[in-house]
Amino acid sequence: MHITILGRQPALGIAELEQLYGADNVRWFSQQTALVDSPDFDFETLGGSQKAGRVVLEIDRGNWLTASRQIVQHYTAKWRAIEHKITLGISAYGFKISPRDVQKTGLLIKKKLRDSGTSLRLIPNPEIALNTAASHHNKLGLSPTKVELLVVRAPNNRIIIAESVGAQNITALAARDQARPRTDAFVGMLPPKLARMMINLSGDTKPGRLWDPFCGTGTVLQEARLKGIDVYGSDLSQKMVDYATENMQWLDNKYQINPQWQVFQADATAVKLNAAQKSEITRIVCEAYLGQPFSAPPKPAKLTAVRGNCNHIISQFLANIRPQINPSTTLVVAVPAWRDHSGKFTHLPLIDQLADLGYRRLHLNLVSDEQLLYYRENQVVAREILLLKPLDEN
Protein backbone atom coordinates (compact mmCIF):
# COMPACT_ATOMS: atom_id res chain seq x y z
CA MET A 1 0.00 0.00 0.00
CA HIS A 2 1.24 3.47 -0.93
CA ILE A 3 0.06 6.93 0.02
CA THR A 4 0.53 9.85 -2.37
CA ILE A 5 0.73 13.54 -1.51
CA LEU A 6 -1.34 15.04 -4.30
CA GLY A 7 -0.42 18.25 -6.12
CA ARG A 8 -1.87 21.76 -6.04
CA GLN A 9 -5.12 20.51 -7.59
CA PRO A 10 -5.73 17.17 -5.85
CA ALA A 11 -8.73 16.15 -7.98
CA LEU A 12 -6.54 15.97 -11.09
CA GLY A 13 -3.96 13.89 -9.23
CA ILE A 14 -6.48 11.33 -8.01
CA ALA A 15 -8.13 11.20 -11.46
CA GLU A 16 -4.73 10.25 -12.87
CA LEU A 17 -4.35 7.50 -10.25
CA GLU A 18 -7.85 6.16 -10.96
CA GLN A 19 -7.14 5.90 -14.69
CA LEU A 20 -3.80 4.15 -14.11
CA TYR A 21 -4.69 1.76 -11.29
CA GLY A 22 -8.50 1.51 -11.33
CA ALA A 23 -11.10 3.01 -9.00
CA ASP A 24 -11.16 -0.17 -6.89
CA ASN A 25 -7.47 0.28 -6.01
CA VAL A 26 -7.43 4.01 -5.25
CA ARG A 27 -9.22 5.98 -2.54
CA TRP A 28 -9.10 9.37 -0.89
CA PHE A 29 -7.39 9.39 2.53
CA SER A 30 -7.57 13.12 3.17
CA GLN A 31 -8.22 16.19 1.01
CA GLN A 32 -4.58 16.24 -0.09
CA THR A 33 -3.70 12.53 -0.12
CA ALA A 34 -4.74 9.24 -1.71
CA LEU A 35 -4.10 5.57 -0.98
CA VAL A 36 -3.08 3.27 -3.83
CA ASP A 37 -3.18 -0.51 -3.47
CA SER A 38 -1.44 -1.88 -6.56
CA PRO A 39 1.72 -3.94 -7.13
CA ASP A 40 2.26 -1.88 -10.29
CA PHE A 41 2.47 1.48 -8.48
CA ASP A 42 5.25 3.59 -10.01
CA PHE A 43 5.66 7.08 -8.59
CA GLU A 44 8.16 8.14 -11.27
CA THR A 45 5.49 8.04 -13.99
CA LEU A 46 3.06 10.41 -12.22
CA GLY A 47 2.44 14.08 -12.95
CA GLY A 48 -0.14 14.93 -10.31
CA SER A 49 1.51 13.71 -7.10
CA GLN A 50 4.27 15.62 -5.30
CA LYS A 51 5.48 12.72 -3.14
CA ALA A 52 4.59 9.12 -2.39
CA GLY A 53 5.48 6.67 0.35
CA ARG A 54 5.16 3.00 1.28
CA VAL A 55 2.84 2.65 4.26
CA VAL A 56 4.70 1.20 7.29
CA LEU A 57 2.52 2.09 10.29
CA GLU A 58 -1.20 2.78 10.77
CA ILE A 59 -2.91 4.28 13.82
CA ASP A 60 -6.71 4.02 14.06
CA ARG A 61 -7.13 7.26 16.02
CA GLY A 62 -4.57 9.67 17.37
CA ASN A 63 -2.79 13.00 17.41
CA TRP A 64 0.81 14.10 16.79
CA LEU A 65 1.94 12.83 20.19
CA THR A 66 0.56 9.36 19.40
CA ALA A 67 2.29 9.32 16.01
CA SER A 68 5.55 10.72 17.41
CA ARG A 69 5.82 7.98 20.05
CA GLN A 70 5.29 5.26 17.43
CA ILE A 71 7.84 6.84 15.07
CA VAL A 72 10.52 7.18 17.76
CA GLN A 73 10.00 3.64 19.00
CA HIS A 74 9.95 2.07 15.52
CA TYR A 75 12.93 3.89 14.00
CA THR A 76 15.27 3.85 16.99
CA ALA A 77 14.86 0.06 16.97
CA LYS A 78 15.19 -0.20 13.17
CA TRP A 79 18.32 1.99 12.86
CA ARG A 80 20.08 1.13 16.13
CA ALA A 81 22.77 -1.06 14.58
CA ILE A 82 23.18 0.71 11.21
CA GLU A 83 26.77 1.65 10.36
CA HIS A 84 25.96 4.28 7.71
CA LYS A 85 24.87 7.81 8.50
CA ILE A 86 21.10 8.32 8.18
CA THR A 87 19.62 11.45 6.60
CA LEU A 88 16.08 11.98 7.89
CA GLY A 89 13.29 14.35 6.94
CA ILE A 90 9.85 14.32 8.52
CA SER A 91 6.76 15.79 6.84
CA ALA A 92 3.41 16.12 8.61
CA TYR A 93 0.08 16.60 6.83
CA GLY A 94 -3.31 17.26 8.44
CA PHE A 95 -1.96 18.12 11.91
CA LYS A 96 -2.44 21.41 13.78
CA ILE A 97 1.12 21.58 15.10
CA SER A 98 4.23 23.73 14.66
CA PRO A 99 7.43 22.92 12.74
CA ARG A 100 9.12 22.79 16.14
CA ASP A 101 6.89 19.84 17.13
CA VAL A 102 8.03 17.93 14.05
CA GLN A 103 11.69 18.75 14.75
CA LYS A 104 11.37 17.53 18.34
CA THR A 105 10.41 14.07 17.07
CA GLY A 106 13.45 13.97 14.79
CA LEU A 107 15.78 15.26 17.51
CA LEU A 108 14.53 12.58 19.90
CA ILE A 109 15.37 9.86 17.36
CA LYS A 110 18.77 11.50 16.77
CA LYS A 111 19.57 11.53 20.51
CA LYS A 112 18.54 7.90 21.06
CA LEU A 113 20.55 6.74 18.01
CA ARG A 114 23.61 8.73 19.08
CA ASP A 115 23.56 6.85 22.38
CA SER A 116 23.75 3.58 20.41
CA GLY A 117 26.48 4.83 18.04
CA THR A 118 24.38 5.62 14.93
CA SER A 119 24.79 9.04 13.29
CA LEU A 120 21.72 10.89 11.99
CA ARG A 121 21.43 14.15 10.03
CA LEU A 122 18.03 15.80 10.45
CA ILE A 123 16.65 18.02 7.68
CA PRO A 124 15.28 21.22 9.29
CA ASN A 125 11.54 21.95 8.98
CA PRO A 126 10.68 25.56 8.02
CA GLU A 127 7.08 24.26 7.78
CA ILE A 128 5.49 21.11 9.20
CA ALA A 129 6.00 19.42 5.79
CA LEU A 130 9.19 19.66 3.76
CA ASN A 131 8.55 21.18 0.36
CA THR A 132 9.14 19.12 -2.77
CA ALA A 133 12.39 20.95 -3.56
CA ALA A 134 13.92 20.11 -0.15
CA SER A 135 12.92 16.46 -0.47
CA HIS A 136 14.22 16.22 -4.03
CA HIS A 137 17.53 18.03 -3.49
CA ASN A 138 18.30 15.92 -0.39
CA LYS A 139 17.50 12.77 -2.42
CA LEU A 140 15.07 11.64 0.28
CA GLY A 141 13.40 8.32 -0.44
CA LEU A 142 15.95 7.29 -3.05
CA SER A 143 18.14 5.07 -0.83
CA PRO A 144 17.78 3.19 2.49
CA THR A 145 19.86 5.80 4.33
CA LYS A 146 18.05 8.90 2.96
CA VAL A 147 14.60 8.70 4.48
CA GLU A 148 11.56 10.96 4.54
CA LEU A 149 8.68 9.99 6.79
CA LEU A 150 5.27 11.11 5.52
CA VAL A 151 2.94 11.36 8.51
CA VAL A 152 -0.64 11.95 7.38
CA ARG A 153 -3.75 12.44 9.49
CA ALA A 154 -7.21 12.05 7.97
CA PRO A 155 -10.22 14.13 9.13
CA ASN A 156 -11.40 11.11 11.20
CA ASN A 157 -8.03 11.20 13.09
CA ARG A 158 -6.72 8.03 11.47
CA ILE A 159 -2.96 8.33 10.93
CA ILE A 160 -0.69 6.76 8.33
CA ILE A 161 3.11 6.79 8.56
CA ALA A 162 4.88 6.05 5.29
CA GLU A 163 8.48 5.94 4.05
CA SER A 164 8.89 8.12 0.97
CA VAL A 165 9.80 6.50 -2.34
CA GLY A 166 10.78 9.89 -3.75
CA ALA A 167 9.58 13.40 -4.53
CA GLN A 168 8.67 14.86 -7.90
CA ASN A 169 11.84 15.39 -9.93
CA ILE A 170 11.48 19.13 -10.33
CA THR A 171 14.98 19.45 -11.83
CA ALA A 172 14.20 17.11 -14.74
CA LEU A 173 10.75 18.66 -15.25
CA ALA A 174 12.25 22.16 -15.38
CA ALA A 175 14.93 21.00 -17.83
CA ARG A 176 12.34 19.48 -20.17
CA ASP A 177 10.38 22.72 -19.96
CA GLN A 178 13.11 25.37 -20.16
CA ALA A 179 16.41 23.75 -21.17
CA ARG A 180 15.16 22.25 -24.43
CA PRO A 181 16.20 24.12 -27.57
CA ARG A 182 12.82 25.60 -28.51
CA THR A 183 10.06 27.19 -26.44
CA ASP A 184 7.37 29.66 -27.48
CA ALA A 185 5.44 31.58 -24.82
CA PHE A 186 3.13 33.04 -27.47
CA VAL A 187 1.47 29.69 -28.20
CA GLY A 188 1.18 28.89 -24.49
CA MET A 189 3.36 26.73 -22.31
CA LEU A 190 1.86 23.37 -21.40
CA PRO A 191 3.63 22.32 -18.17
CA PRO A 192 5.37 18.93 -18.57
CA LYS A 193 3.69 17.57 -15.43
CA LEU A 194 0.24 18.43 -16.85
CA ALA A 195 1.21 16.79 -20.14
CA ARG A 196 2.25 13.69 -18.19
CA MET A 197 -1.02 13.75 -16.22
CA MET A 198 -3.05 13.96 -19.43
CA ILE A 199 -1.17 11.03 -20.96
CA ASN A 200 -1.86 8.99 -17.83
CA LEU A 201 -5.53 10.00 -17.97
CA SER A 202 -5.69 8.21 -21.32
CA GLY A 203 -5.03 4.97 -19.42
CA ASP A 204 -2.10 2.69 -18.80
CA THR A 205 0.40 2.00 -21.58
CA LYS A 206 -1.19 0.01 -24.38
CA PRO A 207 -0.11 -0.90 -27.92
CA GLY A 208 -0.38 1.69 -30.66
CA ARG A 209 0.55 5.32 -31.01
CA LEU A 210 -0.43 8.52 -29.29
CA TRP A 211 -1.32 11.46 -31.53
CA ASP A 212 -1.18 15.13 -30.55
CA PRO A 213 -2.88 17.12 -33.35
CA PHE A 214 -2.03 20.49 -31.71
CA CYS A 215 1.55 19.53 -30.81
CA GLY A 216 3.07 23.02 -30.54
CA THR A 217 6.65 22.67 -29.30
CA GLY A 218 6.13 18.97 -28.52
CA THR A 219 5.62 18.79 -24.74
CA VAL A 220 3.03 15.98 -24.87
CA LEU A 221 5.16 14.09 -27.41
CA GLN A 222 8.23 14.33 -25.16
CA GLU A 223 6.45 13.09 -22.05
CA ALA A 224 4.79 10.23 -23.95
CA ARG A 225 8.10 9.03 -25.35
CA LEU A 226 9.65 9.07 -21.88
CA LYS A 227 6.85 6.64 -20.92
CA GLY A 228 7.81 4.38 -23.84
CA ILE A 229 4.96 5.39 -26.16
CA ASP A 230 5.35 5.83 -29.94
CA VAL A 231 3.93 9.17 -31.08
CA TYR A 232 2.59 11.22 -33.97
CA GLY A 233 2.53 14.99 -33.67
CA SER A 234 1.02 17.54 -36.02
CA ASP A 235 0.39 21.28 -36.01
CA LEU A 236 -1.07 23.90 -38.33
CA SER A 237 2.12 25.97 -38.02
CA GLN A 238 5.24 24.79 -39.85
CA LYS A 239 7.25 26.79 -37.31
CA MET A 240 5.80 24.64 -34.49
CA VAL A 241 6.52 21.47 -36.49
CA ASP A 242 10.15 22.61 -36.82
CA TYR A 243 10.35 23.48 -33.11
CA ALA A 244 8.83 20.15 -32.04
CA THR A 245 11.19 18.26 -34.34
CA GLU A 246 14.21 20.04 -32.86
CA ASN A 247 12.99 19.35 -29.32
CA MET A 248 12.41 15.68 -30.09
CA GLN A 249 15.92 15.33 -31.50
CA TRP A 250 17.25 16.98 -28.32
CA LEU A 251 15.28 14.47 -26.24
CA ASP A 252 16.75 11.59 -28.28
CA ASN A 253 20.28 12.78 -27.55
CA LYS A 254 19.66 13.53 -23.86
CA TYR A 255 17.76 10.42 -22.83
CA GLN A 256 18.77 7.82 -25.46
CA ILE A 257 15.19 6.57 -25.79
CA ASN A 258 13.75 4.23 -28.38
CA PRO A 259 10.05 5.03 -29.00
CA GLN A 260 9.36 6.08 -32.57
CA TRP A 261 8.08 9.53 -33.47
CA GLN A 262 6.90 11.48 -36.48
CA VAL A 263 5.93 15.15 -36.66
CA PHE A 264 4.11 16.64 -39.65
CA GLN A 265 2.28 19.81 -40.69
CA ALA A 266 -1.52 19.52 -40.72
CA ASP A 267 -4.65 21.49 -39.88
CA ALA A 268 -6.43 19.52 -37.13
CA THR A 269 -9.83 20.64 -38.47
CA ALA A 270 -9.15 19.23 -41.94
CA VAL A 271 -6.35 16.63 -41.60
CA LYS A 272 -6.77 13.34 -43.47
CA LEU A 273 -4.96 10.48 -41.76
CA ASN A 274 -3.34 7.82 -43.90
CA ALA A 275 -4.13 4.11 -43.50
CA ALA A 276 -1.14 3.44 -41.22
CA GLN A 277 -1.99 6.35 -38.95
CA LYS A 278 -5.64 5.29 -38.71
CA SER A 279 -4.67 1.77 -37.66
CA GLU A 280 -1.89 2.77 -35.24
CA ILE A 281 -3.48 5.63 -33.26
CA THR A 282 -5.06 4.33 -30.03
CA ARG A 283 -5.10 7.56 -28.01
CA ILE A 284 -5.26 11.27 -28.75
CA VAL A 285 -3.85 13.64 -26.13
CA CYS A 286 -3.69 17.35 -26.84
CA GLU A 287 -4.12 20.90 -25.67
CA ALA A 288 -6.55 22.30 -28.22
CA TYR A 289 -6.83 25.95 -29.19
CA LEU A 290 -7.26 28.03 -25.99
CA GLY A 291 -7.86 31.40 -27.63
CA GLN A 292 -6.13 34.59 -26.58
CA PRO A 293 -4.72 34.94 -23.05
CA PHE A 294 -6.32 37.43 -20.64
CA SER A 295 -4.79 39.16 -17.63
CA ALA A 296 -8.28 40.07 -16.35
CA PRO A 297 -11.75 38.64 -17.06
CA PRO A 298 -12.89 39.96 -20.48
CA LYS A 299 -16.06 41.96 -21.05
CA PRO A 300 -19.10 39.85 -22.00
CA ALA A 301 -19.00 40.73 -25.71
CA LYS A 302 -15.31 39.86 -25.94
CA LEU A 303 -15.79 36.59 -24.06
CA THR A 304 -18.68 35.63 -26.35
CA ALA A 305 -16.51 36.20 -29.44
CA VAL A 306 -13.47 34.31 -28.11
CA ARG A 307 -15.61 31.46 -26.76
CA GLY A 308 -17.41 31.15 -30.10
CA ASN A 309 -14.15 31.03 -32.04
CA CYS A 310 -12.61 28.37 -29.78
CA ASN A 311 -15.83 26.34 -29.84
CA HIS A 312 -15.92 26.42 -33.65
CA ILE A 313 -12.30 25.28 -34.09
CA ILE A 314 -12.46 22.48 -31.50
CA SER A 315 -15.87 21.25 -32.76
CA GLN A 316 -14.52 21.14 -36.31
CA PHE A 317 -11.49 19.18 -35.11
CA LEU A 318 -13.59 16.61 -33.24
CA ALA A 319 -16.03 16.23 -36.14
CA ASN A 320 -13.21 15.86 -38.67
CA ILE A 321 -11.34 13.08 -36.88
CA ARG A 322 -14.39 11.11 -35.66
CA PRO A 323 -14.87 8.99 -38.83
CA GLN A 324 -11.10 8.47 -39.13
CA ILE A 325 -10.28 7.05 -35.69
CA ASN A 326 -10.74 3.61 -34.17
CA PRO A 327 -13.92 3.34 -32.03
CA SER A 328 -11.77 2.23 -29.06
CA THR A 329 -9.58 5.36 -29.16
CA THR A 330 -9.36 7.36 -25.92
CA LEU A 331 -9.18 11.16 -26.21
CA VAL A 332 -7.86 13.51 -23.53
CA VAL A 333 -8.37 17.07 -24.72
CA ALA A 334 -7.59 20.27 -22.81
CA VAL A 335 -10.04 23.00 -23.81
CA PRO A 336 -10.48 26.54 -22.45
CA ALA A 337 -12.80 27.60 -19.63
CA TRP A 338 -12.90 31.24 -18.53
CA ARG A 339 -13.02 32.36 -14.91
CA ASP A 340 -14.76 35.54 -13.82
CA HIS A 341 -14.09 37.75 -10.78
CA SER A 342 -16.28 35.57 -8.54
CA GLY A 343 -14.42 32.37 -9.51
CA LYS A 344 -17.28 31.05 -11.68
CA PHE A 345 -16.32 29.35 -14.96
CA THR A 346 -17.77 29.80 -18.44
CA HIS A 347 -17.46 26.58 -20.46
CA LEU A 348 -17.51 25.75 -24.17
CA PRO A 349 -20.99 25.02 -25.60
CA LEU A 350 -19.66 21.85 -27.27
CA ILE A 351 -19.37 20.14 -23.86
CA ASP A 352 -23.17 19.82 -23.88
CA GLN A 353 -23.22 18.78 -27.55
CA LEU A 354 -20.68 15.93 -27.55
CA ALA A 355 -23.19 13.33 -28.76
CA ASP A 356 -23.90 15.48 -31.84
CA LEU A 357 -20.16 15.37 -32.60
CA GLY A 358 -20.06 11.58 -32.16
CA TYR A 359 -18.53 11.31 -28.67
CA ARG A 360 -19.41 10.45 -25.09
CA ARG A 361 -17.69 11.79 -22.00
CA LEU A 362 -15.96 9.33 -19.67
CA HIS A 363 -17.03 9.84 -16.07
CA LEU A 364 -14.68 8.94 -13.22
CA ASN A 365 -15.70 7.53 -9.85
CA LEU A 366 -13.48 9.54 -7.50
CA VAL A 367 -13.92 13.03 -8.97
CA SER A 368 -16.65 14.92 -10.80
CA ASP A 369 -16.30 16.28 -14.35
CA GLU A 370 -16.37 19.83 -12.94
CA GLN A 371 -13.19 19.16 -10.92
CA LEU A 372 -11.08 18.39 -14.00
CA LEU A 373 -9.84 21.96 -14.35
CA TYR A 374 -6.19 23.05 -14.32
CA TYR A 375 -5.41 26.67 -13.47
CA ARG A 376 -3.37 28.92 -11.24
CA GLU A 377 -4.94 31.43 -8.89
CA ASN A 378 -4.21 34.43 -11.12
CA GLN A 379 -5.26 32.78 -14.40
CA VAL A 380 -8.40 33.75 -16.29
CA VAL A 381 -8.15 30.99 -18.91
CA ALA A 382 -8.22 27.56 -17.31
CA ARG A 383 -7.66 24.25 -19.04
CA GLU A 384 -10.68 21.98 -18.77
CA ILE A 385 -9.75 18.33 -19.30
CA LEU A 386 -12.23 16.31 -21.39
CA LEU A 387 -11.99 12.50 -21.34
CA LEU A 388 -13.79 11.25 -24.43
CA LYS A 389 -14.62 8.06 -26.33
CA PRO A 390 -16.21 7.84 -29.78
CA LEU A 391 -19.87 6.85 -29.66
CA ASP A 392 -20.42 3.32 -30.96
CA GLU A 393 -21.13 3.28 -34.68
CA ASN A 394 -24.18 1.02 -34.38
Residue ranges and their predicted role:
Residues 89-92:
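Short beta-strand segments enriched in small/hydrophobic residues
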Residues 84-87, 207:
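Phosphate-coordination loops involved in phosphoryl transfer and adenosine-cofactor binding
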Residues 76-83:
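Short glycine/proline-enriched loop/turn "hinge" motifs that connect secondary-structure elements
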Residues 1-75, 94-108, 132-148, 153-394:
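Class I S-adenosyl-L-methionine-dependent methyltransferase catalytic core
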Residues 99, 105-106, 110-130:
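A gly/proline- and charged-residue-enriched helix-loop-helix capping module
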